[in-house]
């Protein structure tokens, strides 16, 4: 089964309403917990130890309830097609009434409600999908069978009230944008088989399946149907959704609240016993398949991108040259060379391979300096220029060895101001045991003058220096826009005032900040002031993992405390609303940390191309930007003057 097929069988409508080009659906995602034969046999024998039951996502259509904002789902509204999990259990058996009773299994447990916007009346041609006429019988496009998703919202389910035959869903009033399935679509074709010979029936089925479609024969109408993904992106979109759904389910069934209150079995009498939830076999296999499609999709995108760049290489180089010349005196710390990030080659190597490119004098000088710094390791440098960027995953033993002889952890955390184009900085990194994380500091540009005299900040000095009561309006406007952009694409990390860019959001962030920097310079904010706000954090990989784990444990403790407080029956409505808001924010924070952790620890990181390639880098020689590795508190006045002139390093110790 392909990802697009799974998503269709799970939650997509069979067709579009007749005569409607656009329509919406409220789709209720829940967990079904069927009673397996093994489970029933154990219970019948009185064996109540180590009980397990599989959980599977299922989806229901909903209709508006009497009260505004509420939805009703009934057993007749099941969207998930019955054959989806047939290999695992009899899907129809546990589905009788849609009920949620915490002491009963099997049951249904709410995940979320999706509001999906659809566009129908898709113009599709059978020939484009590999469906050709068979002995005079043609395939035709089904008017009400093709559609695509154009937009979406995700609602949390605050509460459910249940009757014998239906469940009322009380939804969160603040839905979140849900665009994972945007662009996912299906097309349907049909062939009239009245009076057709038997071989046409056989060929129609074979042709549909060989084209990668779902075949269905309606005996009453004597018509064959073939449903196919709308385009190549359908599998990628479906794979992304399956991955998100998996994370949602995993988070649900591992929560302490779920394990204590939901997954219990009522024995005869008052006794209840815990039951361990496990991901159902079919869904677990589907997640693995989706992961493969995501990797293949990223690889295909990368190959297409490289082919396009090869065709237009000269054009791009000319544009880049023009841009460099026009911005030679205009400092822009967020400018990025897309070719380098996409192909994983240092910008320097590209310039050497391009006879048409003329380097500005300043850049040539910088290249010469870099060559001198790397003279001691020519073989290593040559090897890195000719190999794609790849993150070294250290074993625990290797990690421990790498720490021997190093300075303490807090002294390994350093920040470095960008110099010139950011691509030059990336090109100077040498792969070894460090992870490179772009970090944005929220320090005010107005600190610049004080910072020039004091180049070393300690502890939480970053936040202490940001309070400037009479800040110029141009700085205030810049800070406001800057803060909005950073909050959109980054998350606080390790120190107050230090932000780590979210995985996969680098390009979007740089583009927005690129525009903002240009606007700021037009307002008269100097390049030096802007440069002071932009830093890079270098942290050993094992330190990143340890810190993320610490924060995850901390935030989980906070979440449990808030949930416990919500159990208080004497709470006022305003307090409940405030606690729910806190819970939502903490859960979001937890999800972001998990994303960052999975990105940092992911093996074969280079295969994920655009998602993390420009987030994670490793390096060996950083003396050029670190100011000879370390500054001490015993720096003389003469050394401080030299720092002001030639070293933009800012260190957090």
From Swiss-Prot:
Coiled coil: 300-330, 505-649
The keyword Coiled coil is annotated on this UniProt entry: yes
Compositionally biased region (Low complexity): 371-381
GO cellular component, one term: virion component
Subcellular locations according to the entry: Virion
UniProt keyword list: Coiled coil, Virion
Name by which UniProt lists this protein: Structural protein ORF653
Compositionally biased tracts (Basic and acidic residues): 302-326
Organism the protein comes from: Acidianus two-tailed virus (ATV)
Domain of life, per lineage: Viruses
Annotated spans, Disordered: 302-329, 344-388, 626-653
Primary residence: virion
Biased composition (Acidic residues): 630-647
């Amino acid at each position: 089964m392909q990802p697009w097929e799974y998503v269709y069988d799970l939650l997509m409508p069979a067709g579009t309403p007749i005569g409607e080009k656009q329509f919406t659906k409220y789709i209720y995602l829940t967990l079904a917990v069927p009673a397996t034969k093994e489970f029933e046999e154990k219970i019948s024998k009185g064996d109540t130890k180590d009980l397990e039951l599989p959980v599977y996502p299922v989806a229901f259509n909903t209709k508006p309830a009497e009260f505004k904002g509420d939805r009703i789902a009934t057993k007749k509204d099941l969207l998930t097609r019955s054959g989806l999990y047939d290999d695992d259990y009899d899907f129809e058996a546990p589905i009788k009434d849609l009920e949620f009773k915490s002491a009963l299994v099997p049951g249904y447990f709410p995940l979320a409600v999706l509001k999906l916007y659809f566009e129908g009346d898709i113009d599709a041609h059978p020939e484009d999908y590999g469906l050709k006429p068979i002995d005079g019988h043609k395939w035709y496009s089904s008017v009400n069978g093709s559609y695509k998703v154009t937009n979406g919202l995700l609602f949390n389910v605050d509460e459910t009230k249940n009757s014998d035959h239906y469940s009322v869903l009380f939804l969160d009033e603040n839905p979140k944008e849900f665009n994972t399935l945007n662009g996912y679509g299906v097309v349907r074709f049909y062939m009239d088989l009245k009076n057709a010979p038997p071989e046409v029936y056989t060929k129609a089925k074979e042709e549909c399946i060989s084209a990668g479609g779902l075949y269905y024969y309606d005996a009453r109408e004597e018509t064959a149907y073939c449903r196919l993904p709308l385009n190549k992106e359908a599998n990628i979109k479906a794979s992304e959704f399956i991955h998100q759904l998996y994370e949602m389910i995993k988070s649900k069934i591992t929560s302490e609240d779920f394990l204590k209150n939901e997954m219990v079995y009522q024995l005869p009498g008052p006794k209840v016993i815990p039951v361990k939830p496990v991901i159902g076999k079919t869904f677990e296999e589907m997640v693995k398949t989706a992961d493969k499609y995501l990797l293949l999709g990223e690889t295909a995108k990368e190959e297409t991108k490289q082919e396009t760049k090869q065709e237009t290489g000269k054009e791009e180089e000319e544009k880049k040259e023009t841009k460099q010349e026009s911005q030679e005196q205009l400092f822009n710390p967020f400018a990025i060379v897309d070719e380098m990030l996409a192909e994983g080659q240092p910008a320097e190597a590209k310039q050497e391979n391009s006879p048409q490119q003329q380097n500005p004098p300043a850049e040539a000088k910088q290249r010469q300096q870099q060559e001198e710094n790397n003279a001691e390791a020519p073989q290593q440098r040559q090897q890195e220029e000719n190999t794609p960027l790849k993150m070294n995953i250290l074993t625990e033993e290797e990690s421990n060895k790498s720490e021997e002889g190093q300075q303490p952890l807090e002294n390994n955390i350093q920040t470095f101001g960008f110099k010139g184009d950011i691509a030059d900085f990336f090109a100077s990194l040498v792969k070894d045991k460090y992870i490179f994380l772009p970090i944005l500091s929220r320090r005010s540009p107005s600190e610049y003058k004080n910072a020039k005299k004091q180049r070393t900040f300690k502890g939480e000095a970053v936040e202490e220096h940001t309070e400037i009561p009479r800040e110029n309006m141009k700085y205030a406007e810049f800070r406001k826009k800057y803060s909005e952009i950073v909050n959109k694409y980054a998350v606080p990390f390790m120190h107050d005032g230090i932000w780590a860019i979210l995985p996969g959001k680098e390009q979007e962030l740089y583009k927005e900040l690129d525009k903002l920097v240009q606007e700021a310079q037009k307002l008269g904010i100097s390049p030096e002031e802007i440069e002071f706000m932009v830093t890079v954090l270098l942290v050993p990989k094992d330190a990143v993992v340890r810190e993320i784990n610490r924060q995850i444990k901390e935030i989980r403790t906070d979440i449990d405390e808030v949930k416990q407080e919500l159990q208080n029956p004497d709470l006022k409505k305003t307090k409940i609303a405030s606690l729910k808001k806190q819970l939502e924010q903490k859960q979001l924070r937890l999800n972001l940390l998990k994303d960052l952790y999975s990105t940092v620890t992911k093996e074969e990181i280079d295969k994920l191309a655009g998602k993390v390639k420009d987030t994670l880098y490793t390096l060996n020689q950083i003396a050029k930007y670190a100011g000879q590795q370390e500054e001490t508190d015993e720096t003389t006045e003469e050394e401080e003057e030299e720092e002001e002139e030639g070293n933009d390093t800012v260190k957090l110790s």
